[in-house]
Design a protein with these regions (language model features):
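Asparagine-centered strand-capping/turn motif at beta-strand->loop junctions
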Residues: 264-268
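Active-site-proximal helices and loops of the catalytic beta/alpha 8
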Residues: 1-2, 6-111, 115, 143, ...
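Solvent-exposed beta-hairpin/edge-strand motifs
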Residues: 278-292
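Substrate-binding cleft of secreted/luminal carbohydrate-active enzymes
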Residues: 151-171
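Active-site clefts of carbohydrate-active enzymes
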Residues: 112-140
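C-terminal beta-strand-rich structural cap/linker in extracellular carbohydrate-active enzymes
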Residues: 296-319
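Substrate-binding and catalytic surfaces of secreted/luminal carbohydrate-active proteins
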Residues: 124-126, 148, 156-157, 180, ...
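Surface beta-strand/loop "capping" patches
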Residues: 234-257
Length: 319
């Protein structure tokens, strides 16, 4: 494995089925690979393990960063929390609980910033599939909006977003494993040809459409994240959550200048309007996505209004 680093300059390892290997092996393997990478001039070599679970259980994941000494693990708990709150009908407090448990990881909340996050994958299934399973009879329009909202969380909340191929083309699938591994090119697989796609995609054609609404939305989210250091590596503070679908709000703090970006999501089918706690130094704002008030309502308080199944991104600016 060290030869892959030295000969080909790979930037990291994704370790499949990491939970099924004795911890003592990872305790030796990880530092050895990091040392080889540093010697090869790759100081930020990233290693993360797959610890597959369908549960919103950060403790199950975190133990592998403490006992196995893996630098990071795929954040299956993030996928479960977004599935429950956006595809399903759970309150937004499940998201707050997810992030409260960041303290469990070796290195705490700072280490959780480098957890690879996702909402779809090749084993468990696609987010569009979960939306349709958890909400029988849902319209195509609402399915698309919920998938868009899930991706908005993926790109703006803490962690390193992992987009599963085909989600940007409206793939939903019919389950996990083979049922979530459709062809991007024109398929001849009968089960794939009969699938329901989101956003107007035709199941029988090829799927490289840069005009697809999900492709455009994900590209826009990637640009937003790329432009804002706070969204890539800033501290995250949960500002608002509740026991029912509705408002979930967080602040992301710019690691270079300390400025705040407030992100508010609405997981319900009715508009939400609320006062949200912010830093007292954050007084003037500009909209990065959606509609944002130009000024705080009072020191430490900011008004947000979010349409159903939508989100806003409001950035504090220097006065």
């Amino acid at each position: 494995y060290g030869e892959w680093i030295e000969r080909f300059g790979v930037d990291g390892f994704r370790i499949d089925t990491a939970r099924h290997v004795n911890p003592e092996f990872w305790q030796q393997f990880v530092p050895a690979m990091l040392a080889r990478a540093r010697a090869a001039g790759i100081p930020n070599f990233h290693i993360f393990g797959e610890v597959n679970t369908s549960k919103m259980d950060p403790a199950l994941l975190a133990v592998h960063t403490r006992v196995d000494r893996l630098p990071a693990v795929l954040d299956f708990a993030f996928a479960a929390a977004v599935r429950e709150s956006v595809a399903g009908n759970a309150g937004t407090e499940v998201l707050a609980t997810l992030f409260e448990d960041d303290a469990l990881y070796e290195g705490g909340a700072a280490a959780a910033l480098q957890l690879p996050t996702f909402i779809s994958n090749h084993d468990n299934g696609r987010f569009g599939y979960f939306v349709q399973q958890l909400r029988p009879g849902i319209s195509d329009d609402e399915s698309l909006r919920r998938v868009l909202l899930g991706h908005a969380m993926l790109f703006t909340l803490r962690g390193v977003p992992v987009v599963y191929y085909g989600d940007e083309q409206g793939f939903a699938g019919a389950g996990g494993d083979q049922d979530a591994r459709q062809d991007m090119f024109e398929s001849q697989v009968a089960s794939y040809l009969s699938e329901r796609h989101l956003g107007g995609a035709i199941a029988g054609g090829s799927h490289f459409d840069t005009r697809h609404p999900l492709y455009r939305a994900i590209a826009g989210l990637a640009q937003l994240r790329s432009a804002q250091a706070a969204l890539r590596r800033g501290q995250q503070i949960v500002r608002s959550s509740g026991p029912k679908p509705g408002l979930f709000a967080v602040s992301r703090m710019d690691p270079d200048n300390g400025r705040e970006i407030l992100i508010a999501f609405n997981t319900s089918l009715t508009a939400v309007s609320a006062q949200v706690l912010i830093e007292s130094a954050s007084r003037r704002f500009v909209a990065l996505h959606g509609n944002c008030e130009a000024e705080s309502s009072a020191p430490g308080s900011y008004h947000v209004a979010v349409a159903p199944l939508d989100f806003v991104v409001c950035a504090a600016v220097a006065e």
